[in-house]
């Protein structure tokens, strides 16, 4: 008992948020390590190497257009924007944590993609010289890997230090690479848009970490855990970037041709359907019928998450609309009822509500994928279609649809186990009092880790100041209180 109380005392001692030594040390050591590891293990693949000229001759390729770069780069651009702009700005809704949202998103993405290229490379076939060969598709997969860690970041937004985020990313990338290898190469499950591999794993990884790092006195900073008018507008920019580019995300690594084309169409339709049901439920469950910006920023994206696994399947346009329809309802109701329940009953403090945007839709996506695979038939897919979709990579074996459906369900279980188990372990590591995390009363505040300009929240932005003659006098005070002053 004495040891238990002693350990608890260590974890509960006063916080030291000075990261002047720890953050530079981690960044420098990590980057130097990456330079060494890339020098030893990583080389360009044949399509990025100067020997591409000879490769073309050997394979009777007549044009550089056949280089995979020209097929994949447009999708890579879109995915890259989603990672750095979409995810970053989506998390700027907190009134005093925009620097941390965008800046730390930038940091852990740049930190993680390098480690992802190595980890995913080690779990893929190596070149004849024993080196990891990287090309444009590897860059896309590295961005996918980083996306899982950015999803996890949403659960602990404003409550952890940048050093903790880097450690969380290091472990998250490693777990992701193993989980991805098991799901895609051992089980040979299909998950084009990553409903299971990316969203389910990333969300439950972050939620498990948040549960272990539970802060019983977080209400000391509740006045900072909210938005103001302009922070919600910035977050909506992130939503729109994600919404527009999600078809590229779900189709980026599909096979060229009909599969990639179908994945973009299915995602496009699911996203559109989700918007309408999100707006409907948000208005329906608000007493005055007004819309909640939290729902519009987040739940409108749930359809893109849920259609990911089945994106390249013959889901049919109406099927995509159905998936989006139900995901908009489930995700919005999750924000209204489930998020408070998770915090009050299960002690999971989910800052961004990733359980509603990524976890539940990710699980739904896994289930939709399993059902769609099991229901596949020759009448719908044709003989060659079934072979292209369900053939085991590297062999001529094609599974029966019902068997493939079982493997899809098993893959969902793997993602859940890695997310929950890995997140619990990493949460215990992050609970050690050496990472410089903020005290309860200083959460959700950029001033802990950033040089912040003088407070300007009381100043009305120039556009509104210019137009304030259009606002009745009795509305001025209300506008200042609701939109530009911190709520106590």
Curated annotation (Swiss-Prot):
Annotated SUPFAM superfamilies: Ammonium transporter
Main location: membrane
Membrane topology field: Multi-pass membrane protein
MF annotations from Gene Ontology: ammonium channel activity
Keyword set includes Nucleotide-binding: no
Residues carrying a glycan: 60
Tissue specificity: At larval stages, expressed only in the yolk sac and gill. However, the kidney and the gills are major sites of expression in adults.
Origin superkingdom: Eukaryota
Residue spans, topological domain Cytoplasmic: 1-21, 95-98, 161-162, 215-232, 286-298, 342-356, 431-488
Segments crossing the lipid bilayer: 22-42, 74-94, 99-119, 140-160, 163-183, 192-214, 233-253, 265-285, 299-319, 321-341, 357-377, 410-430
Tagged with keyword Transcription: no
Role description: Functions as an ammonia transporter. May play a role in the elimination of ammonia in the gill.
PANTHER family cross-referenced by the UniProt entry: AMMONIUM TRANSPORTER, AMMONIUM TRANSPORTER RH TYPE C-LIKE 2
Record-stated family: Belongs to the ammonium transporter (TC 2.A.49) family. Rh subfamily.
Annotated protein name in UniProt: Ammonium transporter Rh type C-like 2
Source species of the chain: Danio rerio
């Amino acid at each position: 008992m004495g040891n238990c109380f002693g350990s608890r005392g260590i974890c509960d001692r006063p916080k030291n948020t000075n990261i002047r030594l720890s953050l530079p040390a981690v960044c420098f050591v990590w980057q130097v390590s990456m330079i060494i590891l890339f020098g030893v293990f990583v080389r360009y693949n044949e399509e990025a190497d100067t020997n591409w000229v000879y490769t073309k001759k050997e394979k009777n390729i007549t044009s550089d257009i056949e280089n995979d770069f020209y097929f994949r780069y447009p999708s890579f651009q879109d995915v890259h924007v989603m990672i750095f702009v979409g995810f970053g700005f989506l998390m700027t809704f907190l009134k005093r944590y925009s620097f941390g949202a965008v800046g730390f998103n930038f940091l852990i993405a740049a930190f993680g993609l390098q480690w992802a290229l190595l980890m995913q490379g080690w779990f893929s076939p190596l070149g004849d010289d024993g080196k990891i060969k990287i090309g444009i598709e590897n860059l896309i997969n590295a961005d996918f890997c980083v996306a899982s860690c950015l999803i996890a970041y949403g659960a602990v937004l404003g409550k952890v230090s940048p050093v903790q985020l880097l450690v969380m990313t290091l472990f998250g990338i490693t777990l992701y690479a193993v989980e991805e290898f098991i799901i895609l190469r051992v089980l040979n499950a299909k998950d084009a848009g990553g409903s299971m591999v990316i969203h389910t794993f990333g969300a439950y990884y972050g939620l498990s970490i948040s549960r272990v790092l539970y802060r019983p006195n977080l209400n000391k900073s509740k006045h900072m855990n909210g938005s103001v008018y302009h922070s919600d507008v910035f977050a909506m920019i992130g939503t729109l970037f994600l919404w527009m580019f999600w078809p590229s995300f779900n189709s980026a690594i599909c096979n060229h041709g009909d599969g990639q084309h179908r994945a973009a169409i299915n995602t496009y339709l699911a996203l559109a359907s989700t918007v309408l049901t999100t707006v409907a439920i948000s208005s329906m469950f608000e007493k005055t019928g007004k819309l909640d910006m939290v729902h519009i920023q987040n739940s409108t994206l749930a359809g893109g998450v849920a259609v990911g696994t089945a994106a390249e399947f013959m889901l049919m346009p109406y099927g995509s609309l159905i998936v989006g329809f139900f995901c908009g309802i489930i995700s919005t109701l999750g924000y209204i009822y489930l998020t408070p329940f998770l915090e009050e009953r299960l002690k999971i403090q989910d800052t961004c509500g990733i359980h509603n945007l990524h976890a539940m839709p990710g699980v739904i996506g896994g289930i939709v994928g399993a059902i769609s695979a099991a229901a596949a038939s020759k009448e719908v897919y044709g003989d060659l279609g079934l072979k292209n979709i369900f053939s085991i990579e590297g062999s001529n074996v094609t599974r029966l649809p019902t068997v493939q459906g079982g493997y899809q369900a098993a893959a969902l279980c793997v993602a859940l186990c890695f997310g929950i188990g890995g997140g619990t372990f990493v949460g215990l590591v992050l609970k050690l009092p050496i990472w410089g995390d903020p005290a309860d009363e200083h959460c959700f505040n950029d001033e802990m880790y950033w040089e912040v300009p003088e407070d300007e929240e009381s100043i009305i932005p120039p556009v509104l100041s210019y137009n304030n003659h259009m606002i009745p006098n009795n509305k001025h005070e209300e506008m200042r209180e609701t939109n530009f002053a911190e709520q106590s």
